Amino acid sequence: MANYLAQFQTIKSSCDRIVVAVEDVSDLWLNVKESFEQRLPVKKACLNNKARNPVFVENLPAEFIQTTDSRLRSRFPQDQYLFWFREPYATVVLVSCEDLDEFKTILKPRLKLIVQNDEREWFIVFVSKAHPSNDQASKMAKRVYARLESDFNTKKRERCCKFDLHGPDAEFWDDFDSKMVDCIRNTLDRRVQFYEEEIRRLSEQRFTPIWNFCNFFILKESLAFMFEMTNLHEDSLREYDELELCYSESVNSPGKHREFGGLDTGDDQAALLNPGFKALTQIVQDDVFREFEFRQYIFACQAKLLFKLHRPIEVAARGYAFVVSFSKTLALQENGLPFCFREVWVITACMDLIKATTSHYDGTAVAIDSEREFCRIQGDLYSLCRIKFLRLAYLIGYGVEIEKSPVNSASLSMLPWPKPATWPSIPPDSSAETMAKEKMILQAKSREKIFNIHRKPLPLEPSLLLREANRRRAFLSVGNISELYDSGDGSGLDANSKPSPNKSASNYMARTMSGPATSETSLPVDRPMRLSEIHVAAEHALKQTVSDPNFMTSLSSLEEFEKRYMELTKGAADNYHHSWWKRHGVVLDGEIAALFFKHENYDLAAKSYEKVCALYSAEGWEELLADVLPDLAECQKILNDEAGYLTSCVKLLSLESGLFSSKERQAFQSEVVRLAHSEMKHPVPLDVSSLITFAGNPAPPLELCDGDPGTLSVAVWSAFPDDITLESLSLRLSASSSADEGLKAIKSSDARVLVPGRNIITFDIPPQKPGSYVLGALTGQIGKLSFRSHGFSQDGPVDTDEFMSFEKPTRPVLKVRKPRALVDITPAVSSALLMNELQWIGLIVKPIDYSLKDGILHIDAGAGLKIEESQMIEIETYGSDVEHVGGTDASKTSSSSTDTRKVEKVPIEDGKIKIPDWASDVTTLVWFPVRAIDDTIARGASPASPQKQSIVDGMRMIALKLEFGVFLNQVFERTIAVHFTNPFHVSTRVVDKCYDGTLLLQVILHSEVKATLHVKDIWLDLQSGFEHTGKGDGRPTSNLFPLVIAPSSRAGILFVIRLSALGDMDELEKADSMLNIKYGISGDRTTGAHSPVPVKPDDSEELVFKIAVKMKRPVLDPCVAVGFLPFSSDCLRVGQLVNMRWRVERLKNPEDASLLADEILYQVDANPQNWMVAGRKCGHVSLSNKQGSRIEITVTCVPLVSGYVHPPQLGLPHVGEANISCNPAGPHLVCVLPPTLSTSYCIPA
């Protein structure tokens, strides 16, 4: 079967669509050809895939070919099954007949003969030539078509359709397409089953000696190609995948040696996307194909199918994996391949994949995740191509011009040198090229970095090229040691170390006479190659390997190499930036920046370096950052970017101290200080969080009360290598419950010099709001620049630097308590003091865990109260603090003294008292004299005026304000009420009436104070209408003075009086009797009222108290009697009318002429909230002057509320109360019932 390989490839290249055979029985094809071909490709077809599942295929490619065509008739029967995929998938039989007899005798037998082949899928198209206007011909055509249907249609399948030549309808084309697709589907199913059986038969022979992979390949690819022709690309791809696996097993199986391939011209150019790169007959070897060409052929077929499936992302992914794996295969065959064949092939393969997948990729039709994945794979392809290209550049001598960056080191150190069987020898007549390479090596020197930074170069190769090349020379196993380790190429581990002058001669001799010098006959045939010669030899060998002149152009000069190197690096970086692996793109930006820097394009170099530094800083890769950051600083310095340059210098100082020497770090600091003190055009605040860090002391946090200032000590660490002077330093506190740093900065005005390491800085804390505070930020100024630090440090041992950390501390450094009572001031006396007398008022001042040192007490007396400032204020200890103060006072510790109470007299000025120092921490009692002023005359209680004086009248208010604290910032304010009262409350009553008209008047003295009262004398000045009996001096009948009245007790005194002649009634009503009491008081000021404070030394202790007493003449001879008549009803209800009746009777003729009138004025007084008066409230009634005359007054009222209420009262305004007798008296309260329930408002249940 392998002999058919050439024929198979020819058939496959010429067959790109399925064939539909046309059996033209009635010579109709030319008439219907155009109409039929317009139906191709089939717009929609339902086919079965390999798993027998229906698949809808769009635009199925097909071609109509007549059975008489040479393309079908020239095929041999023996290869019909082998290449069955090219045979027709359906047969369309075109017939036409206008006579039924002709159909029976001629057409029907011929059709029977055509369709008797069971392997052919067919259907009949009856072409009607009858014109629509010819009814007879149309009827005959219908009869013939009906007979055709009955002869060739079956119950399971209809095989006939009618085509009207003069105007086919749409239903015919639908029927035609349906029948054609059914035939194609059935044929495809049968052929798939055939190929599967043949493939299964051959697969069973895979481990037998007769196994032939070429036969298996032809069957497998025939099936795959048949799927591809029918647009079943998924099934075709699956067949190629299985074919690849089967080939891998076959080629890796032990057996005879097989050629690998790759030795033909042009094989260095990858053919991953060109399946027709070589004919299959060229790569076949016995029963299998050469691996180099066949693997690329299989991948090219897979890629072609994936592109048809619109899956360029999968092509890129598969392609990258194939290039990596096939590169390993090439490495195993490197001894038999041309020099650097693997590197060249990988570069061309990656570039072909990038171009093809990019051209087929439509980014608008994919999801964002798929787009990023595609860009990631493209970046990998670019990166792989870039590294291989970089390796070629090192081989031909351009390595000295390449930036020795960490990314290049990491990539190239894992990429071995080429391993040919024999390293290429230097061609003849190449001395000029050798000298040019030698000159390039000698003139190459590493770029000096800013600040004279010297860093050990990173290795870029797994081993020295010089040793590797000489080791692989066929006639020399190893060279002279000094020759093999020559580092003049700059690619060794000590690239920056220059050879000393005394070694130059020995090096020259080593190059001339390499090898051991034991004897003259032991010299080698040829000396080891120098590095320049290795570069020249590699370049000439590479030219023999590379077949693409454009590829070799990119290595022809250093400029062309850098151009191509920039394209590859930019391609990788740009794709990584649009993918998931953005960090890879940023790292490659550093390589782009190095080229920009080399060509003095500092602006673009700085932008790229900024991205790289930002990434390294965020990831914490300080060693990598230390390699790139100086380059950024140099670009910024050249561009005169002072702000950026300053920031870079600060970052360099922030890096780990071991990455730079002390001199280098001091150079960084000097640049920072120089810029800070210079006139910058655009000064920017510096973030020195990694250089200046701070933390609170390990001691407990500073605790302050609300409103108090304080002093906070903060430990500040400086990472500067030398002392640095700060023009100012400020600290911000942050509430631990909030991240807001809105608190005002606490400034330290002095210039601070921070030494390297730990510094203790103190800050004066102003009053803060209550809460817990942590360190927020440290700000300040270095020269003319402001800086800010958020670098928090954890507490740790003071003697070590292990406490340094950048974690925010949670331990607070300051706690401000919530507002609480720091002091309490309460009155020392709760009982009443004497009114209008100078009395001591005591205040208990109690500090609550807070010092009142230097405190000032403000006393503001309210209305009716006066402070006597001429008197000294007394301050004494109080309560349990007596012993404490006494024990600390040396003046009170004498053995003869048993009272340790400390008393001090201080003056009061403008209501201010200064608290003594000894009283700042103990509870004290402050006594100051006040006088409550009341100009009104006290009034006693009597039946005529029973009201008692209200306690509110004796209240006086004192406003207290205590300023204390360090800066008198704490204020305590309170207003206290002090009760003042008269010493006595007097009530009078007539206890008896004698026969001679005298009255016994009892005066009861009630003590109003908690002190003992000594009544020394008392007399009563009577009002008009009364007079004393006896001596008439107003004294009581008995002489019991001095009379002692205990606290809260009372005493009674009798006066004998009688009525006297009446004067004016108005004056009599207004006049009062005056009771005069001369008394003394003995009390303690700690209890309440006490003896008045003497203003002058000769002030008497006797006091006089006057009180007015209202006396009313008794009703001894009434003129009119008013009696309340009972209600007509026993019960009163709300809303019910009630008649109030009073009877008025004249008892005698009045002596007063004003009472002789016949009419009397009456007035009804009722509470409007309880009663509604329906009649007249006020009016005149006629009452005769004769004794015994009577009259009844009736007023109708309505009660408004239920309960016990006062009834209305009848009054006679023109008749005095002394002339009216109430008999019978009216009720004090009456009961009013609620109204009866009204059924009209009831709702039935």
From Swiss-Prot:
Superkingdom of the source species = Eukaryota
Q: Where is this region: Disordered?
A: 488-524, 884-903
Principal localization? Golgi
Q: Which residues form the signal peptide?
A: none
Query: Which residue ranges have biased composition labelled Low complexity?
Result: 495-507, 888-898
Cellular location(s): Golgi apparatus, trans-Golgi network; Early endosome
The gene behind this protein is: TRS130
Assembly description? Part of the multisubunit TRAPP (transport protein particle) II complex composed of BET3, BET5, TRS20, TRS23, TRS31, TRS33, TRS65, TRS85, TRS120 and TRS130.
The record's annotation in Pfam families points to: TRAPPC10, TRAPPC10_1st
BP-aspect Gene Ontology terms:
early endosome to Golgi transport; intra-Golgi vesicle-mediated transport
Q: Which UniProt keywords apply?
A: Endosome, Golgi apparatus, Transport
| Tagged with keyword Transport | yes
Function field: Specific subunit of the TRAPP II complex, a highly conserved vesicle tethering complex that is required for the proper transport of proteins in post-Golgi trafficking pathways to the growing cell plate in mitotic active cells.
Say which family it is in: Belongs to the TMEM1 family.
Cellular component per GO, a single term: cytosol
Q: What is this protein called?
A: Trafficking protein particle complex II-specific subunit 130 homolog
